[in-house]
C-alpha cells in the first residue's frame, strides 16, 4: 500500500531537473598577465646574479606561488624571502598619507584579512619549500638584512614605507640585480605615493625613471 502511495505522489510532484552549478573561474592575481610574464623575464635576467629573490609586500601569496612555481619549472635555485605585515597597512603610514599627502580618510585601506599562517599554508599546499616568510613592518625592519639580493619585487603601495625600502634594498642589490617597484602610476590617486617615492629615489641616484607595463618601475644596479 505504501509503495502505491509513493508512486502516486511521485507522479503528481512537479518534475524538476537539478543541474550542477558550473565552475566559475575568476582571475585572482594582482598583476595582469603581461606583468606576470615580465616578472618571469626578470627571474631569467637575474638567474646568474648572486643573491636571493625578495618580495616585499606579498599580501596573501598569489604572486609568490606563481613565481616560485616558475622558478621550479625553470630550475632557478635561489632562496625566496617574502615580507609583509600580514595584517594590512600600519596606522602611521595611513596617517602620513592623510596628513602630508592630502588623502581623504577611508581611501587607504585593504589587505587586513590576512595571516602569516595562511600565507605559509599556501606555500605548503603548492609544494613550495624555499620561501622564508617574515612578518614585519617595513618601517621597522632593517631591509639590508635581506641581502644580497638578485631580484626584488617591492609592493608596499604607500609613500613612507616605499621611500625607506627603496634606499635599503638598493644598498644590498647585487651588481646586475633588478628592483621592480609596483604601483608607479601617478594617475592612481590611491597608490600614487609609490610613484612619488620612486621618482624621488631615481632622481637622487641619477638613475633613469623607467616604468613598464603601466605601473612597474625598474631600478637596475650597474654590473
Set out the residue ranges of the language-model regions.
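S-adenosylmethionine/decaboxylated-SAM
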Residues: 16-33, 40, 47-223
Amino acid at each position: 500500500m505504501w509503495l502505491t502511495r509513493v508512486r502516486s505522489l511521485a507522479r503528481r510532484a512537479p518534475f524538476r531537473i537539478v543541474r550542477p552549478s558550473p565552475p566559475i573561474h575568476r582571475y585572482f592575481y594582482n598583476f595582469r598577465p603581461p606583468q606576470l610574464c615580465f616578472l618571469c623575464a626578470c627571474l631569467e635576467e637575474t638567474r646568474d646574479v648572486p643573491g636571493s629573490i625578495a618580495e616585499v609586500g606579498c599580501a596573501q601569496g598569489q604572486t609568490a606561488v606563481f613565481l616560485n612555481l616558475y622558478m621550479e619549472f625553470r630550475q632557478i635555485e635561489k632562496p625566496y624571502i617574502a615580507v609583509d605585515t600580514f595584517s594590512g597597512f600600519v596606522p602611521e603610514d595611513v596617517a602620513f598619507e592623510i596628513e602630508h599627502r592630502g588623502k581623504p580618510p577611508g581611501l587607504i585601506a585593504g589587505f587586513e584579512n590576512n595571516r602569516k599562517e595562511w600565507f605559509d599554508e599556501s606555500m605548503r599546499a603548492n609544494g613550495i619549500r624555499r620561501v622564508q616568510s617574515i612578518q614585519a613592518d617595513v618601517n621597522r625592519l632593517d631591509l639590508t638584512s635581506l641581502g644580497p639580493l638578485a631580484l626584488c619585487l617591492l609592493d608596499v603601495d604607500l609613500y613612507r614605507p616605499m621611500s625607506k625600502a627603496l634606499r635599503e634594498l638598493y644598498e644590498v642589490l647585487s651588481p646586475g640585480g633588478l628592483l621592480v617597484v609596483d604601483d608607479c602610476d601617478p594617475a592612481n590617486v590611491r597608490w600614487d605615493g609609490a610613484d612619488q617615492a620612486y621618482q624621488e629615489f631615481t632622481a637622487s641616484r641619477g638613475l633613469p625613471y623607467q616604468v613598464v607595463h603601466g605601473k612597474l618601475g625598474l631600478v637596475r644596479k650597474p654590473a
